[in-house]
Amino acid sequence: MGEPGHGDDIMSRSTQSAASEFAPTAALCEQHRQIRKLAADLTTMTQQSGFSDTEEFGRLRVAISRALQAHFEAEDRVLGHAMWSKSGMPAALLADWDRRRQRFRMSYSQHVRDWTLADAARDWAAYGRAVALCIGEGETLARFEETEIYPLTA
């Protein structure tokens, strides 16, 4: 989910490290890796000269939406109870995380509403810029989770 073409190897190593170090969140880190791969595929598609593959475009959008939904549900299952009930957890940090998650979810939902298939086809370059912004927001959230939130469950 990083900048197009930048940091993929670094992020993969970061995710692998987090997954091995914090066993309760290994599956969540793997989901981040899968979402990053889908995002990279969409980024590659948007960097092409024009909109051409309606089927692949639709498949990627659906796959990303499903992966994000599954990830948020998994976080709620894996982290929800442990994070909010464990004594000594920093309440301000958890509240910040909750706000960040909600902000990203709302932003992503708005992005999907704003960029229908027809809208993306009509202004492919602008769609590519919007995708890069959305992916950047998601990457910021994922890095925050991997460095600030997931380690709290260890």
Where on the chain are the PLM-derived regions?
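Small-residue-biased structural context
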Residues: M1-A154
